[in-house]
Amino acid sequence: MPPKNCTHLGGCNSDCLTRSEIQALFREAINTLKHTMNTEDVCAHMLDIVSFERIKEYIRANLGHFTVITDKCSKRKVCLHHKRIARLLGIKKIYHQEYKRVVSKVYKNQTW
């Protein structure tokens, strides 16, 4: 049976990736481009929509090959988290603004 995509609700039998791990993955993808001398737009900021688009396409195209290895688990397939990665790649705010938005949403609608 193929693995289910992560819904971030814990039922996918796959450890969810943290935002830090996803950011590290983005950095490693950019480092791979640099290592292969494919340096066009590697210094682009995520909010620079036009320049960063090439980096986003590279990440999307290679999600099936990426694996995050940490002390938690050695076989966390990144492709299971493609929706979360797409959302993070699509954020059009600086992270401080996004953090404030998420925190205010969570604390506005407390569920615990």
Swiss-Prot record:
The keyword Chaperone does not apply. GO terms for biological process: regulation of DNA-templated transcription; viral life cycle. Keywords: Transcription, Transcription regulation. It holds the Pfam family Baculo_LEF-11. Signal peptide: none annotated. It comes from the Viruses. Involved in late/very late gene activation. Belongs to the baculoviridae LEF-11 family. This is Late expression factor 11. It comes from Bombyx mori nuclear polyhedrosis virus (BmNPV).
